[in-house]
Amino acid sequence: GCTDVLCCVIFVIVILGYIVLGTVAWMHGDPRKVVYPTDSYGQFCGQQETPNANKAILFYFNILQCANPSVLINLQCPTTQLCVSKCPDRFATYIDMQYSYRRNKGSWEYYKQFCKPGFNNPDKPISQVLRDEDCPSMIVPSRPFLQRCFPDFITRNGTLTVANQTSFKDGHGKIRSVVDLRDAANGITSLLDAKEVGTKIFEDYASSWFWILIGLVISMLVSLVFILLLRFTAGVLFWLVIFGVIAAVGYGIWHCYWEYSSLKGKPDSDVTISDIGFQTDFRVYLQLSQTWLIFMTSLAVIEAIIILVLIFLRNRVRIAIALLKEGSKAIGCIMSTLFYPIITFLLLALCIAYWAVTAVFLASSGEAVYKVMSTLPDCKYTNLTCDPETFSQSNVTKLCPGSQCTFAFYGGESLYHRYIFVLQLCNLLVFLWLVNFTIALGQCTLAGAFAAYYWALRKPADIPPCPLASSFGRALRYHTGSLAFGALILSIVQFIRIILEYLDHKLKGAHNAFTRFLLCCLKCCFWCLEHFIKFMNRNAYIMISIYGKNFCTSARDAFFLLMRNVMRVAVLDKVTDFLLFLGKLLISGSVGVLAFFFFTRQIPVIQEEVPSLNYYWVPLLTVIFGSYMIAHGFFNVYAMCVDTLFLCFLLDLEKNDGSATRPYYMCSSLRAILNKKNQKRPKETKRGRKQKKEQPKSRH
């Protein structure tokens, strides 16, 4: 019958509510608020069919104000912001413009591009212009970055310059250093260099996505070939994997030593990494001998660990290989299980896409909210809401001279707008629940198919038809509530971990040692709890697929079964995981080496096809990580197969004794590994033997 019906009902209601949440967010949200920058009046820059259609860049009247601490609080710069068609390309001040305007009318035509729309009075006194904020007091050579005008910084011989100048006029009669501009730019961009790296990385993805996709397809084909070979030659192939990894790591040690030796004696190669600090060009680190020494030492430690594990666990490795051979036979009988990860991937992609779209629409919900921005530390109106239409006539401008009524964010006073943050948290929690349910559904489906293989007395004759489809149908029809229950427990723990990570990020600058220590302990505890729940859920789903009981009963039975066989679990299961991990490393490593030679233009045949990149390691790391995840998806089928067969084997040992009435269901190879035998039936008469021969026919 159905298990955990109450949780199933709650799960269905939550899904319906999630659909309603997405619909409401879609009705209220506007992704343009995320895509386009917004000026001080809440208008989009660059939006078609608006006055700003040809003005796609945001310009700051006084970017020096962006170094104010209020930027960190309000995420807005306390100065007027306008949409412009292009950034200024020269130094100029309003005072100099007025002086030259008497001789050259063209100076005003250029300067007024950066004034408020409709303002056309270059003779207006500078004091009144700055009071009414009709025009900026100065402009500096800038370039667009993230659709915003930022000073065009260039470092020449270690000196920071803007348009080959190290100083400028600030429009108030003072000479300022361009370092002040950099500090202001950093205040609003939150580490401009990091964002520049992000832009270059995005450009690299845009130019190399096709080749990244080819690399991932190659890794998928290699993974499939690896699994097919494993079906027939598990022992030989895995020993080749082991020695292949040892050889690859050994080559890495030799290559690092060769690079380390070749850098000896070269100028500046003995500089330490701490001396040069963080560099956006990672090729700088490859010119340091210390970098290659660290690589060589790390690889040597990895090599030693692998060799020691093989020496002390060689007998257990043989047992694990035999268990994998049995798993290979099971997958050979149910080949459709190899392609089930595709279903899981599509379901996960659907969950991720729905969550991301809902999050964007929630973030872009609401009307424009304006707040008072002031550079005066004692202004009591700072950060309060205001109306830009009536702000100039209010008392705020008198009590806080120079204050601005600036667009802050999109929000509102309705019940929906007040609880957008709570809705975002709900969006995240339900997303985690759906993702974990999808993974649980896959695990239970595979476990049911492999359990059907194990409990077939005559393999493959007694295996039911379409075991994977049957297991999938049973899991959805009878055990949706149990799978949702286990997924919910795991999702809550993951949700708490995300909150702890957020708090840790916010408290990085705190000096309270006890708070940091407590937070670190909580993160460690919940990390351990998450991994324990994942392990128990996996085995609980196997028990559900075998006995069809509810989640709590299955989890309890699985836990005590594993505790009664803790040594077998600790050795056999983990050695199997280790061997599969080596296979993932070999696949991702070999595809990664191929990608390295391709993106560094070391393959002459296709050298001209390589796109021009800012950082070749961007597509390289993407291919390596993607290859590892693809191999991980395919090998998860094997891991689930081995775990299911192993759990079934433990149950077989406890429920049966090898007698004629209770024979072992395990195959002969597993019985040989553990020295177990089925008792022979006593000698029978010819008639009895004849009846015995006819017995299988009677079962059908």
Swiss-Prot record:
Compartments where found: Cell membrane
InterPro entries the record matches: Choline_transptr-like
Cellular component GO terms, alphabetical: membrane; plasma membrane
Membrane side Cytoplasmic: residue ranges: 1-4, 231-233, 314-341, 456-482, 563-577, 638-687
Keywords: Antiport, Cell membrane, Glycoprotein, Membrane, Transmembrane, Transmembrane helix, Transport
Catalytic reaction annotation: choline(out) + n H(+)(in) = choline(in) + n H(+)(out)
Side Extracellular, residues: 26-209, 255-292, 363-432, 504-541, 599-616
Pfam families per the UniProt record, alphabetical: Choline_transpo
Transmembrane region(s): 5-25, 210-230, 234-254, 293-313, 342-362, 433-455, 483-503, 542-562, 578-598, 617-637
Main localization, broad class: membrane
Basic residues composition bias: residue spans: 677-692
Biological processes, Gene Ontology terms: choline transport; transmembrane transport
Bilayer topology term: Multi-pass membrane protein
Disulfide bonds: none
Residues of this chain annotated as glycosylated in UniProt: N157, N164, N383, N395
Function summary: Choline/H+ antiporter.
Family: Belongs to the CTL (choline transporter-like) family.
Designated name of the protein: Choline transporter-like protein 5-B
Gene that specifies this protein: slc44a5b
